[in-house]
Amino acid sequence: MPRIGLLIVTAVLATVVAGCSKESDQSSEKSPDWQRGRAVFLANCVACHNNDPTKDGSIGPAIAGSSKELIESRVLSTSYPANYKPKRPTKVMPQFPFLKEEVPYLAAYLAK
């Protein structure tokens, strides 16, 4: 009987460990552009936006699914594209001109 219990416990633990590592496996399967965009996002955006771009941050809104056009407008000039209705029409976001080359990578990361 003890062997069966040990086998069951081992199987349960293996299942839990496999489930925990699923997210890291998925991110390693992402493109280099996605991974670079994630690094840029974590280094420059999470002070205001949530670590999880699908959720609102302390200051900034959720930004997952944002278009490249919107990201470029907001990051480089803090404006909005024509005919875009903002989630929060604030003037709080600063410009990040040094991220000009990173916009395509941010767009890859934030795409749905």
Language-model features: locations:
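Sequence/structural segment immediately N-terminal to covalent heme-attachment motifs in c-type
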Residues: K30-N51, E72-S73
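Extracytoplasmic electron-transfer domains, predominantly the class I c-type cytochrome c fold
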Residues: A62-K112
